[in-house]
A protein has these predicted regions:
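Outer-membrane beta-barrel pore domains
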Residues: 5, 9, 13, 29, ...
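N-terminal periplasmic/intermembrane-space "pro-region" immediately following the signal or transit peptide
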Residues: 1-46
Length: 354
């Protein structure tokens, strides 16, 4: 008991002598914990397998254009202050034919996002989406700025401007050797109850284009609109349309694009056993879409020219493991005249999320 009293007295003496140091240490630990909470990580491991068959491919009755890749993705988010956050996406892709696994990492996104009441701004390299037409026209990265204003819960307007590298170089003439171009768009959207609708205007600026009406202007324009109706919490129907322009090189392809899709439920990564399915009929066009959100769209020439039916389903095997399968059956509207234009495709994906 005497020893315990002596130890207690020694502890009290040391605590009094080093009280300032202990207090400062506590502050530093608290600051470190706060800083740690400022950065959060998420990501996935993804395996994709895709096969497209185009009967019109010269010299082949039926050719297979395959895609077999593994992806590792990291997505950090950082709190800057009460209004601003930072975001990034880093992808490391490995193709099946690259056994050395040295395809390398690529920073797909890096941007700052600010939120001030009803006003949102993104600056840097970020993902943009054509909300008006549910992704019929655009779903890819842009380096620039995007401003969104939502005056009410039902209405919002969005303006996007910057550089993008997803404008297919096959669509331009002259000395162009990359897919880069200047892109800007304005959109207005409405969502209330079971309904949503939108209207958008998109412009691509470049040196020259292969369209008859605009050969020396260096730009082309797309107007898109869409509407969606949710019959209940499980079933939703969407219809989207995009007006493009006439073209020279791909004159057999459609000028306009559209998509009609019926969705049932959908897999939830947090809910094992959840699933969803959809059926859609689409027509894509080289000058009416830029970087569509669908997995099927490019024909044998590498431009958006597929038309036909698409079905798909997804399923959550266990928490954070989701599988997807899709099938396309239709035709390639840009196929060589006189050749069979039949086109089919299969797409599968497994996501391991963390």
């Amino acid at each position: 008991e005497a020893a315990d009293n002596n130890n207690k007295a020694l502890i009290d003496k040391l605590a009094a002598e080093f009280s300032d140091e202990l207090a400062n240490l506590g502050v530093r630990v608290a600051d470190l914990e706060a800083k740690t909470d400022n950065v959060k990580w998420q990501g996935l491991i993804r395996y994709d397998w895709k096969s497209n068959n185009f009967a019109a491919n010269p010299g082949h009755e039926k050719t297979n254009d395959g895609d077999n890749t593994v992806k590792l993705r990291f997505e950090p988010s950082m709190v800057i202050n009460e209004n601003w956050t930072g975001h990034a996406r880093i992808d490391y892709d490995v193709n099946k034919d690259n056994t050395a696994a040295d395809d390398g990492a690529e920073v797909q996104k890096i941007y700052a996002e600010g939120q001030y009441s009803k006003f949102n701004v993104k600056l840097g390299r970020f993902g943009t989406f054509s909300d008006a037409s549910h992704g019929l026209v655009m779903d890819d990265q842009v380096t620039g700025a995007e401003f969104t204003y939502a005056p009410t819960e039902a209405w919002k307007v969005k303006a996007t401007a910057g550089r993008t590298d997803v404008v297919n170089k096959e669509l331009v003439t002259g000395t162009k050797t990359t897919d880069a171009a200047t892109y800007w768009a304005v959109e207005a959207g409405y969502a209330q109850g079971k309904w949503d609708a939108g209207l958008g205007y998109h412009t691509v600026l470049d040196t020259h284009t292969n369209q008859k009406t605009n050969e020396n202007n260096g730009s082309y324009h797309i107007v898109d609109l869409g509407v969606g109706y949710a019959f209940d919490k499980n079933v939703k129907l969407t219809g989207d349309y995009a007006w493009g322009v006439s073209q020279d090189k791909y004159k057999d392809a459609a000028n306009n694009a559209y998509s009609i899709e019926l969705d049932y439920k959908g897999a939830d990564a947090a809910d094992a056993g959840s699933w969803g399915a959809y059926v859609a009929y689409r027509q894509l066009a080289p000058f009416a879409t830029i970087s569509y959100t669908y997995d099927f769209g490019a024909g044998d020439a590498g431009v958006a020219s597929l038309k036909g039916w698409e079905i798909g389903a997804n399923y959550t095997f266990t928490k954070n493991i989701v599988a997807t399968a899709k099938y396309f059956n239709g035709k390639d509207t840009a196929a060589v005249a006189g050749k069979d234009d039949k086109a089919t495709g299969v797409f599968t994906r497994v996501d391991f999320l963390f």
